[in-house]
Amino acid sequence: MNILLSSTLFVLLMFQIIGSGMGCDMKVRGLDANMKKMILDLHNKKRQIVANGQQSGQPSAANMKELHWNDEIAANAQRSAETCVFEHTAKSLRKTTKYSYLGENIYKGSYPDPIPRSVNAWYDEVKDVTPAVVKSFSSGGPMIGHYTQMVWANTEALGCGLVTASDRNSYLFCQYGPGGNYRSQPIYKQGPPASDCKNGKSSKYPGLCN
């Protein structure tokens, strides 16, 4: 192989890598134990607020599950974050050995506190959710899908990945199993908190189900 051909192939390869986002210059990658706990706690606290009927304009939830951290989902989300591309992961790649479909929330920003900022931003979509949408999910209208995935009753597992690039932008990808946001399906069953739990109430979050 001559030098010119070798150089051409190298340039093409680098173009493919950078174009796919894999050429991102990562300053920080991954989540430590405290960061994982922060993300999980923020999600469950938000879910409990809604389940207990403490969120203005939202009915209480009879069957909303407590979320648990899942390392396989987190590894999947980390791979997506490391592309440094602010786009949802292809649905065909959002699955694990247990879950055939994972929901996903994504965030990009240059603020120094990406975890609380992203979770709060997703949750803030609650202002556009009506009891009618809780009863029958619809994606038409204002953006609400980040919030509705956060509080989807049947979702039980969470895993996230984080990258901070050299341009100071952070990319946080969170994936949820099983995924939610199914059109015409209820986000959760309306009723007294944790009144329709199949396996009892959570000991840490009594408004949520095990």
Curated annotation (Swiss-Prot):
<keyword id="KW-0732">Signal</keyword>
<comment type="function">
    <text>Voltage-gated calcium channel inhibitor.</text>
</comment>
<dbReference type="InterPro" id="IPR014044">
    <property type="entry name" value="CAP_dom"/>
</dbReference>
<protein>
    <recommendedName>
        <fullName>Scoloptoxin SSD976</fullName>
    </recommendedName>
</protein>
<comment type="similarity">
    <text>Belongs to the CRISP family. Venom allergen 5-like subfamily.</text>
</comment>
<keyword id="KW-1015">Disulfide bond</keyword>
<dbReference type="InterPro" id="IPR035940">
    <property type="entry name" value="CAP_sf"/>
</dbReference>
<dbReference type="Pfam" id="PF00188">
    <property type="entry name" value="CAP"/>
</dbReference>
<dbReference type="GO" id="GO:0090729">
    <property type="term" value="F:toxin activity"/>
</dbReference>
<keyword id="KW-1218">Voltage-gated calcium channel impairing toxin</keyword>
<dbReference type="InterPro" id="IPR001283">
    <property type="entry name" value="CRISP-related"/>
</dbReference>
<dbReference type="InterPro" id="IPR018244">
    <property type="entry name" value="Allrgn_V5/Tpx1_CS"/>
</dbReference>
<dbReference type="GO" id="GO:0005576">
    <property type="term" value="C:extracellular region"/>
</dbReference>
<keyword id="KW-0800">Toxin</keyword>
<keyword id="KW-0964">Secreted</keyword>
<keyword id="KW-0108">Calcium channel impairing toxin</keyword>
<dbReference type="GO" id="GO:0005246">
    <property type="term" value="F:calcium channel regulator activity"/>
</dbReference>
<feature type="signal peptide">
    <location>
        <begin position="1"/>
        <end position="23"/>
    </location>
</feature>
<keyword id="KW-0872">Ion channel impairing toxin</keyword>
<dbReference type="InterPro" id="IPR002413">
    <property type="entry name" value="V5_allergen-like"/>
</dbReference>
